[in-house]
Amino acid sequence: MRHYEVMVILDPDLEERAVSPLIENFLSVVREGDGKVEKVDTWGRRRLAYEIKKKPEGIYSVIDLQAEPAVVKELDRQMNLNESVLRTKVLRPEVH
């Protein structure tokens, strides 16, 4: 398994209480693929550097996880299919 960091920017029109269940829904893909979710850090609403889909703000969430590459690819695919997700970025942090 490899370590990944996933950043998700969600639609700011989502209610605060809808953010956690949405993230958990995405994380079920990781858990079903025998991956481990190490940390979920929701930053809340932040101003975007530029508008995405005509939205000046987004709800940021950063997820640290360990999973196989195929599982992370499926997670990214699921996120991109969801209309509440403005942008995703999957990174493999450097080992120090």
Swiss-Prot record:
InterPro entries: Ribosomal_bS6, Ribosomal_bS6_CS, Ribosomal_bS6_sf, Ribosomal_S6_plastid/chlpt, Transl_elong_EF1B/ribsomal_bS6
Keyword rRNA-binding: yes
Record's GO cellular component terms: cytoplasm; ribonucleoprotein complex; ribosome
Gene Ontology molecular function: small ribosomal subunit rRNA binding; structural constituent of ribosome
Domain of life of the native organism: Bacteria
Organism phylogeny: Bacteria, Bacillati, Actinomycetota, Actinomycetes, Kitasatosporales
Entry's family note: Belongs to the bacterial ribosomal protein bS6 family.
Function noted in UniProt: Binds together with bS18 to 16S ribosomal RNA.
Key words of the record: Ribonucleoprotein, Ribosomal protein, RNA-binding, rRNA-binding
Protein name: Small ribosomal subunit protein bS6
GO BP annotations, alphabetical order: translation
Organism: Streptomyces griseus subsp. griseus (strain JCM 4626 / CBS 651.72 / NBRC 13350 / KCC S-0626 / ISP 5235)
The keyword Ribosomal protein is annotated on this UniProt entry: yes
Family annotation (SUPFAM superfamilies): Ribosomal protein S6
